[in-house]
Amino acid sequence: MSKMKRWQKVVAVFLVIVLFLGIVALYLLCPRTTAKEVDNWLGEESFDIQSIKTIDKTKDDFTILAITDIQFDNPFYSKKDVKTAIKNMIDKTNPDLIVTGGDNFAGIFNHFHVKAFTKMMDEFGVPWAPIFGNHEYDFHSDLYYLSKQMMKSENIIFDVGPTNIDGVGNYLINIMDGDSIFYSLVLMDSNAEVFRYDGRGNRLYSYYDGIRPSQIEWYEDNINGLAKSEGRTVDTILFSHTALPQFNDAYYAIKNNTPLDGVSVKYNYGNMVEELGGCRYEYGMYEKMAELGSTKYHFFGHDHSNNTSLNYNGIDMTYIQNTGHNKDDQIGGTLIKIDSDKNVSHEIIMGNS
């Protein structure tokens, strides 16, 4: 064989390898999508108590283990340690429900991560209810595809929610005591990042988004719908990935000993290690919560090192203890207990044995 032919063969083999690797990379990197099933919310007339997800209260107390920011399959953090910590918390608390507070998985391979995360959650054998954080949006991931994969779980309680309002996965779970609603959980998508540009298309800055006006209207319709159905205001707990701006106001009022006009604030527990990274933009969610008088507790994550709980004008605003990004002895969650008289208590629970 001449040198020229040998060289041509080497080049051909090299090109075949490059083509093969390119196909593999395309398969791995290409985001997965699915058809969106249209479900339009048309105001209070769309409220249907029968369509709301439910879970039965089977003992005096109803306990929720809230975990957050697992960012499953992130190569920089140990899945084994996180899984062990969650299992330890389940063994300690015997929860009726696990709520995952967003950033459940992260990165360019979210379409694979969601499957591994869902498999892990199913292995615990406990009903679980997820919300989305900002990292589920990574690399333009299709949240409807991610939702479809999670809904293959045997133990999940989840609803994609209306498709004509902001966010994906805005839904309620009614905790049932016989035929009546004992308590209700409101789970909402606080969306991802917002980017601002100048007139020439240059990015000026970005900030984390929050619960938007269309979602607030949906929230109001559901709170009013629950009240009409039950003949009373139904007590609710809100879960979202990021805090409301009022948390920041309360924190600095307490830290700097500067009272807020017409507002009472109180420190409950925990530490603020990093600045509030959640929503700084005022969409009006707190005002609507205060007006309707149903939601007295809000739990959120996002800022990995914080576990502070404050009270702002009668509403507890509480960071869920981080589950995926801390050192082993700081991996944990937040245990929420609703007793038979509907009194709510919450505390940090650690994942070490």
Regions found by a protein language model. Give the residues of each.
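N-terminal Sec-pathway targeting helices
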Residues: M1-L19
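Divalent metal-coordination and catalytic microenvironments
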Residues: D69, I86, I98, D103, ...
